[in-house]
Amino acid sequence: MEPMTDKFKDALVSLRRQLHEFPEVAHQEGDTSNRIADFLNHFEPDKLIRNLGGHGLAALYEGKTEGPAVMIRCELDGLPIGEETTVSYRSRNAGKGHLCGHDGHMTMVAGLAPLLSASRPAKGRVILLFQPA
């Protein structure tokens, strides 16, 4: 999938809506982690590290030469608060919701994977970190 195309945009909208529909609270982010890993694997990170601090994961994109590392981080967990909206992608997990914006933040960070896959860093490495609660 080429970055910055309608297909790319549609994939990000779909990911964000899936994350929003199925929020998981602190220390129970297993399905969220798997969903993010499935998305990232399409964009061939040099290394995908799982089970960091529980359900956390990190995707590493290596540069062509040695250099500094840049880490971009987001959180995986939702809140133990029910959602009262009527949108089609509202939370399907009773009493849980991404009313904190973490679903959007995860999508933004995951959205860097296609860009990094298409254009690796010139030097150093970029780490996309998805942190559990």
Model-based region annotation:
Residues R125-I127:
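Residues at or immediately flanking beta-strands
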Residues L76-G78, L129-A133:
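Acidic, glycine-rich active-site loops and adjacent beta-strand->loop/helix elements
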Residues E2-H98, T107-K123:
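Acidic/His- and Gly-rich active-site-bordering loop/insert found
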